[in-house]
UniProtKB/Swiss-Prot annotation:
CDD domains, per the entry: AP2
Record localization: Nucleus
Entry-linked Pfam families: AP2 (PF00847)
Predominant localisation class: nucleus
UniProt biased composition (Polar residues): 109-124
UniProt DNA-binding residue ranges: 7-64
Protein name: Ethylene-responsive transcription factor ERF003
Cross-referenced InterPro entries: AP2/ERF_dom, AP2/ERF_dom_sf, AP2/ERF_ERF_subfamily, DNA-bd_dom_sf
Natural source organism: Arabidopsis thaliana
GO cellular component: nucleus
Keyword Calcium: no
Length: 181
C-alpha cells in the first residue's frame, strides 16, 4: 500500500517519480506550465510564486506568504520569461475585470433608465444587441485577443458548405415505396 502524501494545489507526480507544476487562470482560460521539480514542495512553491504573480495578493496558495521574509535561492523557482508571461496574464485579467465592471455599470444605468421609462429590465436586456466583443489588450500592445461570435459562426457555415461541395457525388434515394396509380 502506498504511503499517503500531502497533496499540493497545482502539483502532480509523474509515474516515474518527478513532480510537475502548472497553473490555470479561470478568467483567461489559460494554462501555464511551470516546470518539473525534484520534490513536491519545490513544485508547490513554484505554483505559489506563479499564483501571486498571476492573481496578485488574493491568490490561493499552498503555503502562507510573508512579504518581509528574506528571499532565498529556492524562492526564485521561475525563469524571467515565465515571470513576464505570468505578469502579462495578471495585467490582462485586471483589464478584463475593469471592462466587466464598466459593462455592469452601463447595464445597470440602462436598466434604471428603462425602468423609469416604463419598460422592464428584462425587455431592455432583450432589445440590446446580441453580439458582444471582448477585447484584451496586453501591456506591451503586441497581442489583441478578440472574441466575436457572429463572424466565427458565418465562417464555420461557409466552411461546411465548401466541404459539402467538394466532398464528391452523393446519391439520394427514396426510402418510401412508390405508389402505382
Amino acid at each position: 500500500m502506498a504511503r499517503p502524501q500531502q497533496r499540493f494545489r497545482g502539483v502532480r507526480q509523474r509515474h516515474w517519480g518527478s513532480w510537475v507544476s502548472e497553473i490555470r487562470h479561470p478568467l483567461l482560460k489559460t494554462r501555464i506550465w511551470l516546470g518539473t521539480f525534484e520534490t513536491a514542495e519545490d513544485a508547490a512553491r513554484a505554483y505559489d510564486e506563479a499564483a501571486r504573480l498571476m492573481c496578485g495578493p488574493r491568490a490561493r496558495t499552498n503555503f502562507p506568504y510573508n512579504p518581509n521574509a528574506i528571499p532565498t535561492s529556492s524562492s526564485k523557482l521561475l525563469s524571467a520569461t515565465l515571470t513576464a508571461k505570468l505578469h502579462k496574464c495578471y495585467m490582462a485579467s485586471l483589464q478584463m475585470t475593469k471592462q466587466t465592471q464598466t459593462q455592469t455599470q452601463t447595464q445597470t444605468a440602462r436598466s434604471q433608465s428603462a425602468d423609469s421609462d416604463g419598460v422592464t429590465a428584462n425587455e431592455s436586456h432583450l432589445n440590446r444587441g446580441v453580439t458582444e466583443t471582448t477585447e484584451i489588450k496586453w501591456e506591451d500592445g503586441n497581442a489583441n485577443m478578440q472574441q466575436n461570435f457572429r463572424p466565427l459562426e458565418e465562417d464555420h457555415i461557409e466552411q461546411m458548405i465548401e466541404e459539402l461541395l467538394h466532398y464528391g457525388s452523393i446519391e439520394l434515394c427514396s426510402v418510401l415505396p412508390t405508389q402505382t396509380l
